[in-house]
Amino acid sequence: MAQKENTYPWPYGRQTAQSGLNILPQRVLRKEAVTPSALVLMSRSNTQPTAAPGQKVVENSSGTPNFSTRSFTIDDFEIGRPLGKGKFGNVYLAREKKSHFIVALKVLFKSQIEKEGVEHQLRREIEIQAHLQHPNILRLYNYFYDRRRIYLILEYAPRGELYKELQKCRTFDEQRTATIMEELADALIYCHGKKVIHRDIKPENLLLGLQGELKIADFGWSVHAPSLRRKTMCGTLDYLPPEMIEGRTHNEKVDLWCIGVLCYELLVGNPPFESASHNETYRRIGKVDLKFPPSVPAGAQDLISKLLKHNPSDRLPLAQVSAHPWVRAHSRRVLPPSAPQSVP
């Protein structure tokens, strides 16, 4: 018989609700690319949620069952194939039994989380991601736990990691890169408006939805900072901005640097400051030693150069990223912006 979930207090620090999100890294896992069977499963399930006999399915305006007000146990899910494996646990394709809604169930082992001392990162990921709702941000619907494991109920991104797609293609064309830049800019405008800094934008932390739309994931390094000023080192070396490697106070403008690095990597196939040693990478970042191969279009060079500025206050604002002539000329965004944008 399955262990009974949700009878034990949150094991890390102050107590948190045992299940439900209406009370309020380490890279953990990777997701595989979509398979035909998964697409069929989604088309049969997520487009037409059905209820168990005598059970009404409550949906929100987006057609997603309202998971945030329910308590869950592992017995509420049919578990499918693994989507990814990591040092803290695994991610599985899963279907909630009452609604037949397809999700990605991230199963984390408490022992591993405690061993690595990343309890605070997990808590931060849950508290931040659960309260973000944007078409280009991966949803965290709810969580629950038992004696040994913590379960995160996540939106399923059928086309998997942007990182794996980039590995397969080597580089992206202007249309795809510009579309990603517009999606990222819109999602980060939303995050920054809620005083959330992601701090770890990179291909491994970006997923692709059913129509290829971008989904920002992995908020383990992100922070909800009302002051929007931090001084801790985090993120991935190739994507770290000068103010972080120099130990200076940083704010939400670190994300502007990150999307500049990402834009370069998508078009070129490697990050702009990648070097044979960490010390050389640090040196190149500090000097903003930016060199473009001839293959990078002039418009993209202009955008990247305006984002990769040593002084954070000189970096191009997100609204101007969306409105940049190169982005406007090439972006073919699938989903509409979350709100009208204006260029300051």
From Swiss-Prot:
Positions bearing Phosphothreonine: T35, T64, T232
Catalytic residues identified in the record: D200
GO biological process: cellular response to UV; cleavage furrow formation; midbody abscission; mitotic cytokinesis checkpoint signaling; mitotic sister chromatid biorientation; mitotic spindle midzone assembly; mitotic spindle organization; negative regulation of B cell apoptotic process
PTM note: The phosphorylation of Thr-232 requires the binding to INCENP and occurs by means of an autophosphorylation mechanism. Thr-232 phosphorylation is indispensable for the AURKB kinase activity. Acetylated at Lys-215 by KAT5 at kinetochores, increasing AURKB activity and promoting accurate chromosome segregation in mitosis.
Coiled coil: none
Record domain Protein kinase: where: 77-327
Recorded GO MF terms: ATP binding; protein serine kinase activity; protein serine/threonine kinase activity
Activity control: Activity is greatly increased when AURKB is within the CPC complex. In particular, AURKB-phosphorylated INCENP acts as an activator of AURKB. Positive feedback between HASPIN and AURKB contributes to CPC localization.
UniProt-listed Enzyme Commission number(s): 2.7.11.1
InterPro entries: Aur-like, Kinase-like_dom_sf, Prot_kinase_dom, Protein_kinase_ATP_BS, Ser/Thr_kinase_AS
Chain positions found as Phosphoserine: S62, S227
Modified residues annotated as N6-acetyllysine in this record: K215
Residues the record lists as binding ATP: L83, G84, K85, G86, K87, F88, G89, N90, V91, K106
Intracellular or extracellular location(s): Nucleus; Chromosome; Chromosome, Centromere; Chromosome, Centromere, Kinetochore
SUPFAM superfamilies: Protein kinase-like (PK-like)
Major localization listed first in the record, in broad terms: nucleus
Catalytic activity: L-seryl-[protein] + ATP = O-phospho-L-seryl-[protein] + ADP + H(+); L-threonyl-[protein] + ATP = O-phospho-L-threonyl-[protein] + ADP + H(+)
Classification via SMART domains: S_TKc (SM00220)
GO terms for cellular component: centrosome; chromosome passenger complex; cytoplasm; kinetochore; midbody; nucleus; spindle microtubule; spindle midzone
Family the entry assigns: Belongs to the protein kinase superfamily. Ser/Thr protein kinase family. Aurora subfamily.
Self-association and partners: Component of the chromosomal passenger complex (CPC) composed of at least BIRC5/survivin, CDCA8/borealin, INCENP, AURKB or AURKC; predominantly independent AURKB- and AURKC-containing complexes exist. Associates with RACGAP1 during M phase. Interacts with SPDYC; this interaction may be required for proper localization of active, Thr-232-phosphorylated AURKB form during prometaphase and metaphase. Interacts with p53/TP53. Interacts (via the middle kinase domain) with NOC2L (via the N- and C-terminus domains). Interacts with CDCA1. Interacts with EVI5. Interacts with JTB. Interacts with NDC80.
Function (record text): Serine/threonine-protein kinase component of the chromosomal passenger complex (CPC), a complex that acts as a key regulator of mitosis. The CPC complex has essential functions at the centromere in ensuring correct chromosome alignment and segregation and is required for chromatin-induced microtubule stabilization and spindle assembly. Involved in the bipolar attachment of spindle microtubules to kinetochores and is a key regulator for the onset of cytokinesis during mitosis. Required for central/midzone spindle assembly and cleavage furrow formation.
Protein name (database record): Aurora kinase B
Lineage: Eukaryota, Metazoa, Chordata, Craniata, Vertebrata
Gene it is expressed from: AURKB
